[in-house]
Amino acid sequence: DTWEKEGKIVPLRGFCSSQNEEIPKQYDEVKMYSAWNVAQSNPCFEIWLYYHFYENKPVDEEMQTFVSFKEYVSSTISGGFDFQRDPVRLEDAIVNTRNNFSQDADGKPTLYSSEVYVLGEEIDKFVKNDLAKLRNKLG
């Protein structure tokens, strides 16, 4: 739980927090370019993985027994997310993530929301046929 920074050992959470302070500024700068898209997730990227399997937002009471959302996702997806097998669930993830998406007054994703479904929609255009073949193969 420590990280080397400028020759000093600091708590990892503190290091990550200090690195993340610039994210809102960088987000606003990137959004100025119409050819670029930024996809944020709250609380983390794993909410996108979660929506590959689940239609509804996580239940807060279940979350309280876990240290992190990543740990929660690992425990709720039997065997964890399999990057070889589970991409066939892309269309489910897009629908589930879109249906559960909401923003706050500043336009930032609220808890258990992700904008990654927008990227998923773009990827799906290119892999739709391959995913259909893989789904048929997996039965």
What are these regions (language model features)?
Residues T2-G139:
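C-terminal accessory helical subdomains adjacent to catalytic cores in phosphodiester-
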